UniProtKB/Swiss-Prot annotation:
Pathway the protein contributes to: Glycan metabolism; N-glycan degradation
Protein name (record): Beta-mannosidase A
Pfam families in UniProt: Glyco_hydro_2, Glyco_hydro_2_N2, Ig_mannosidase, Mannosidase_ig
Keywords (A to Z) from UniProt: Carbohydrate metabolism, Glycoprotein, Glycosidase, Hydrolase, Polysaccharide degradation, Secreted, Signal
Signal sequence residues: 1-21
Source organism per UniProt: Aspergillus niger (strain ATCC MYA-4892 / CBS 513.88 / FGSC A1513)
Record's keyword annotation contains Transport: no
Keyword DNA repair belongs to the record: no
Length: 931
């Protein structure tokens, strides 16, 4: 049966914007089934969901353990239909009825009441379809059916069409499934070098039936809330003395009211204090949007800052739309913050030159008018199936980011545009999100239909997330300019200028105006890695003139993207790029034994077993073969060389212990290599390149396999994340040993905005822990003062000048103690950091058994660790399966007699506390010992 509006009012979705005369049915409350000819049966389904997950819940398939990702390809090759049970209780007296889908993945045909309504082909768009006529002719309660076509089959058919766009051979990059560039779907669904290829399908975001019961009734589809300084332009530094401007624009479904008014109320979320209530000016109606603006003259809201730079002050903004008769038509609430964020790509000024900064152009971020050092990593999709990514999981992941002293994540394309709740978490925790449009490592079609489709995608998502203070940037895509255009130049030199034109047509002439038309507060870069622009002329057909192939000697432009799998130069500072900002760099490693055991049988836990090799997708298969041993051997060999070149080679008699030791060894190499690069990049803040950012690849894993991640699937920290937490502290001391020339320099680097002063103690020990006579000719303590956002060399020598009896039996311990003011703080803070240097590679050191002892404190989650007989390098505390968390300190150095009390933060425990009895400790010595 159907209901009147009075009875239905109680069913309004409580989290949706409120509007006049609407009835909303959340389709997740309905019962659903999933069917396919490939399955020949019907199973219960959820909504939102994806096919693989419903089949898993129904017991049709198992988890993708072992090589089961290959065995599940039949799912991606089939068409699947989600069908609702008859939907009861819709209104009889409605003016119009709509189906609203916040996300369909991807090629979907929608039927309602037995009538085909529409087809969709973009995972990232919101769709609304008028089904009033279909419902009116429906005999009985309506049934909604959504048929999802096989994405691999559909894009293959598009590619084979003679009218489809073609590209030069050897340009496009295929990981597993081919032809991903023809679809507006998560590109990594077709495989990447760190994850599987499931090509999932399904209603991956919520959907609603919306009924409007009056002609003036509306439904709010999307809201664009833009907060910026008066006169602010996306590509110019905002004037911080100007008042704030609030621009509110609401996209509605239904008839636009004539001569509407708009008002806002701005309330402090912490205190509840109202900052202002006012009517908006210049209210306009265009398309399906109602827009108004106001200037907050004389008001000084508390600013939002990234973590480590200040507080995350947030405000609730209530936006109300009223009709000509002062009746409320719609009301929307958005939580936001007052901040400016600006990507500075302007030319180096004479004043900067006078400070010692090399010529060229800037490439760094400024928040609220302040330069800062961006410390962070790259975020990939946290799961192969977005519908099982929870707010709890993302909150835990972002907590690890904050604890890890990171203030920025690059949201890599091509995954998916992040859900609103993920931006909410970033707002709360102070994590800036460099965001990108979902185009990656490919050339894409440039026909009008494709461009029209992606234009709608971009407008929707730019408007959707614009109110979040954590939003830091929009980039057009991943490595299009730095990788794909050079690939064209190599493969088809005569066509290079044509494809540059195609690139500019899409990423500059189309995307840039779409961003600028919908936000004044966010900068835009056409690609993740560029050399910046020559000039911007918004009236020109190509409004941003890019700087391609810069070769100006002594000048620095743009950001850098760096991967070098030649392990012989892993610690050669001369092999690292010198630039203004490092947005992507890294090397892969194995996950821990505990994580492997979640997905791989015991008999397969060998370093080069078939299962381990085939779960390694670097180098990628480049197609759908299931025997990618040759390409995988490249990546496995790179990890092997990283270990054997620098670290003791594990050789345990028990194959599980040996496998675990090898996994750990690859993590040691990875962590040391990243540490070496980040120390180099951070030191660059005080060098002519004025380097102000390092975002390593990558934050987290999508499954259990070798990858570049610092956090494994399931939440366990690799050595990498612990080391990054240490080296991203505000003030650090770093040794720089040039193994070719023998030079040894020690630098102090600071991210603070004002000078910090203190001392660095330099202590030479042999590996038994005895002081080296005369401290090897090195001063025992060096005072220093380091400027804000700067670095300073505090000591330098050559190894040949040191009084070291044996460089293989020596370690330099560096202990920094300083005082300084954290950004936006009036108090002086004590700052400490410890580091070390050896003048031989770990494999060549004459290490001794450090005699590690571990004890349990009266506090259940605290342990004490002590070295009794030698220097413990790479001291590593580990915990068993059944618990997830992290030690407050790990991967550290202990001298004999030194004792550390270290707490463990428990995030999840299924052992009822028994895990504490199985904490272990090891060091580099254990990697060397045969057993």
């Amino acid at each position: 049966m159907r209901h009147s509006i009075g009875l239905a009012a109680a069913l309004l979705a409580p989290t949706l914007p409120v509007a006049l005369g609407q009835y909303i049915r959340d389709l997740s409350t309905e019962k659903w089934t999933l069917s396919s000819r490939a399955l020949n049966r019907t199973v219960p389904a959820q909504f939102p969901s994806q096919v693989h997950l419903d089949l898993l819940r129904a017991g049709v398939i198992g988890e993708y353990h072992g090589l089961n990702d290959f065995n599940l390809r039949w799912i991606a090759a089939a068409n699947w239909t989600y069908t609702s049970q008859p939907i009861k209780g819709l209104l009889d007296n409605y003016d119009s009825t709509w189906l609203v889908f916040d996300g369909l993945d991807t090629f979907a045909t929608i039927s309602f009441c037995g009538q085909q309504i529409a087809s969709t082909d973009n995972q990232f768009r919101q769709y609304a379809f008028d089904v009033s006529t279909a419902l009116g002719s429906c005999k009985g309660d309506p049934v909604l059916s959504i048929n999802f076509g096989s994405a691999p089959n559909i894009v293959d058919a598009i590619a084979q069409d003679s009218n489809s766009q073609k590209w030069p051979d050897d340009v496009q990059l295929t990981y597993e499934y081919p032809n991903r560039w023809f679809m507006r779907k998560e590109q990594s669904d077709f495989g990447w070098d760190w994850g599987p290829a499931f090509a999932p399908a399904g209603p991956w975001k919520p959907a609603y039936i919306v009924q409007l019961d009056k002609k003036e009734s509306v439904y709010v589809l999307n809201t664009d809330l833009d907060i910026y300084r008066k006169g602010q332009i996306n590509y110019l530094p905002p004037d911080q003395s100007q008042p704030w401007v609030v621009n509110a624009s609401i996209d509605i479904l239904g008839p636009l009211p004539t001569k509407p008014t708009m008002s806002i109320e701005v309330r402090d979320t912490h205190s509840g204090t109202i900052l202002t209530s006012r009517t908006l000016n210049n209210v306009s109606v265009a398309g399906n949007a109602i827009t108004g603006v106001t200037v907050l003259d004389g008001l000084t809201p508390k600013l939002w800052w990234p973590q480590g730079l200040g507080d995350q002050n947030l405000y609730n903004v209530s936006i109300t739309v009223q009709s000509r008769g002062n009746q409320t038509v719609a009301s929307v609430n958005k939580r936001t913050g007052f901040r400016t964020i600006f990507l500075n790509q302007r030319n180096i000024t004479e004043a900067q030159r006078a400070q010692g900064i090399a010529p060229g152009a800037n490439w760094h971020f400024e928040v609220n008018g302040h330069e800062f050092y961006a410390k962070g990593s790259n975020l990939i999709p946290p799961d192969s199936f977005w519908t099982r990514v929870t707010e709890e999981k993302m909150s835990r992941l972002f907590d690890a980011v904050v604890v890890g002293n990171q203030n920025m994540l690059r949201v890599w394309s091509s995954g998916a545009y992040l859900h609103d709740y993920i931006y909410d978490l970033a707002d709360e925790k102070g994590i800036l999100l460099w965001s990108e449009f979902e185009f990656s490592d490919a050339l894409y079609p440039s026909d009008d239909a494709f461009l029209e489709n992606v234009a709608a995608e971009i407008v929707y998502n730019v408007r959707r997330v614009n109110h979040h203070p954590s939003l830091a940037l929009w980039a057009g895509g991943n490595e299009i300019e730095s990788l794909m255009l050079p690939r064209v130049k190599d493969a088809a030199p005569s066509s290079y200028s044509y494809y540059v034109g195609e690139y500019e047509k899409m990423y500059i002439s189309l995307f840039l105006p779409l961003v600028y038309e919908n936000t004044r507060s966010i900068s835009y870069s056409p690609s993740s890695t560029t050399e910046g622009y020559l000039y911007i002329d918004l009236s020109a057909p190509v409004p941003m003139a890019e700087r391609y192939d810069n070769t100006t000697s002594g000048s620095y432009y743009g950001d850098t993207d760096h991967y070098d799998y030649d392990t012989s130069v892993a610690f050669d500072y001369g092999s690292y790029p010198v630039g203004r900002f490092a947005n992507e760099f890294g090397f892969h490693s194995m996950p821990s034994l505990q994580t492997w055991q979640q997905a791989v049988d015991t008999e397969d836990l060998y370093f080069n077993s078939s299962v381990v090799m085939l779960r390694n997708h670097h180098d990628p298969a480049g197609g759908l073969m299931t025997d990618n041993y040759a390409n995988s051997a490249t990546g496995m060999g790179e990890m092997t060389m990283g270990v054997v070149s620098y670290y003791p080679i594990p050789s345990k008699s028990d194959h599980i212990s040996n496998f675990s030791a090898w996994c750990h060894a690859t993590q040691l190499f990875q962590a040391d290599m990243y540490k070496s690069q980040i120390q180099f990049y951070r030191r660059g803040s005080g060098m002519p390149e004025r380097q102000l950012g390092s975002l390593y690849w990558q934050l987290e894993d999508i499954w259990q396999a070798p990858s570049w991640a610092g956090i494994e699937y399931g939440g366990r920290w690799k050595v990498l994340h612990h080391v990054m937490r240490d080296i991203y502290q505000p003030v650090i001391v770093s040794p720089f040993w040039n193994y070719t020339t023998g030079s040894l320099d020690v630098y102090v680097t600071s991210d603070l905005w004002s000078p910090a002063a203190g001392t660095v103690d330099l202590t030479w020990l042999d590996l038994s822990g005895r002081p080296i006579a005369g401290n090897a000719g090195t001063p025992k303590s060096v005072p220093f003062t380091v400027g804000g956002l700067n670095s300073t060399r505090i000591y330098g020598t050559n190894v040949s000048s040191l009084g070291l009896p044996d460089t293989k039996d020596a370690v330099l311990i560096l202990s920094l103690s300083a005082h300084g003011r954290l950004p936006n703080s009036d108090r002086t803070t004590n700052l400490t950091h410890e580091n070390y240097a050896t003048l031989s590679w770990p494999k060549d050191l004459k290490i001794v058994d450090p005699g590690l002892k571990i004890g349990h404190s009266s506090k259940k989650t605290t342990v004490t660790v002590e070295a009794t007989s030698g220097v413990s390098l790479y001291t590593w505390l580990d915990y068993p399966e059944g618990v997830v968390g992290y030690f407050e300190e790990n991967a550290f150095v202990l001298a004999p007699g030194e004792k550390k009390e270290i707490s463990f933060t428990v995030l999840e425990d299924t052992t009822d506390g028994a895990w504490v009895r199985n904490i272990t400790v090891q060091s580099l010595w254990d990697q060397k010992v045969r057993g």
